[in-house]
């Protein structure tokens, strides 16, 4: 946290949101890497041409409590008779990858048909019929679009694209899902949250630990914090479709595939850590690792295999 404290001493970053979550099995980021990147997030065509620094072109940020109110209002709207058109249309848009949705998402959010954020094209389709685009045919002026992602950065960037396409009512969750789970607990959320580090997946309770300590102090004063208990979400095996015991992805053992997927124990053993039969017979295979360990660099497995073959011969 020393770096965060140093950063906040600069008046330009005094109000920056720093999010902290626990790493049960050791430090999730043991090394600090500083790299120059032309773009914070990767998009087809780059992002240099986007008006990212113009706040009016980005989605309007909602605090976690405001976001929760929007979701609850959306639920009430959906429960009204079909002929009642007095309320505004509300669309919940998950601006993440499909595999992230698979282990957890806000109730009512459709699974994004995206495997890499770079290829996201919501609201950009020119086809008359495009069932894969959740924004296709949406009334741009009379629909509130609620965008969310893990930490909020992808939404900030992508909302400028949608704004340029004429979508007028864009809202994003400030600080993303991780900030929401810390503040509001599991309300309206099901499952775990995918994270891009060795932890892979975190249950909402891990994010809410700090928030719960704050709640305990409030409850002593008789304040109802409104936290909800977690809703159970059943992930499905990518291979056979059965329920999985743990909401954590693994990479395909084939280095040339490397797909992130959920897998049941039976398929895991049957395919030796691969996502399909084709990958099972691929030439460059890594060993099946116990639990949800992450693979190391390919050369370590390649060299180990070469050494074994040399000794055998």
Where do the language-model regions lie?
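Rhodanese-like catalytic fold shared by cysteine-dependent sulfurtransferases
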Residues: 1-60, 65-79, 88-90, 97-146, ...
